[in-house]
Amino acid sequence: GRIIKNDPNAAKYLNSPETLIFNKRKNLFGLNLAKKSKLGYLILVEGYMDAIALHQYGFDCAVASLGTSLTEEHATLLSRYTEQVYLIYDADEAGQRAAQRAIPMLERAGLRIKVLKIRDAKDPDEFLKKFGPDKFKILLEESANRVEYQLNVIRGKYDIREDDQKIRYVHEAAELISTLG
């Protein structure tokens, strides 16, 4: 379940424990619907409510991990249904860290990755309610490939007006670029 009222002292999600029948590491919320989508890609979000909102607004290709971080099993499951994944995690620091952890798993599964960073809202659900599906579609079209996204994350760590920080940024960016192809 998910808390509806905003309570900073309560967990946002309360999830069932894993059992022999229900294995969160191997299932994705909404996949039963998303695998039928004609859009040609899947959208991976953090929360059930994000996936539900996306479906309500016409993005019938949205899935969410079931109250757990993305796993290798999830990535493999995604690769059975698509070659392209839009990774759209919450805008907060935890969501962006989770996106960074998800990228290599999705790559190992052979998926092409686009990363969309939500602006002016905390998550896809809130964004859709505030701005609607047309603005969300524009965000999808403007989403970054994983290298652009990671370079932007690195850039955000440094004030490149300072020489020492500019040097640190260039070194870290070069390290990322050296891992490519």
Feature-to-residue mapping (PLM):
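Conserved catalytic cores of soluble enzyme domains
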Residues: 68-120, 127-133
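Phosphate-handling DNA/RNA-contact segment within nucleic-acid enzymes
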Residues: 1-81, 85, 98-99
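Generic hydrophobic alpha-helical scaffold/packing signal
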Residues: 35, 79, 103, 125, ...
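C-terminal or mid-to-C-terminal helical accessory/interaction module adjacent to the motor/catalytic core
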Residues: 112-181
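Residues at alpha-helix boundaries and short interhelical turns
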Residues: 38, 89, 93, 180-181
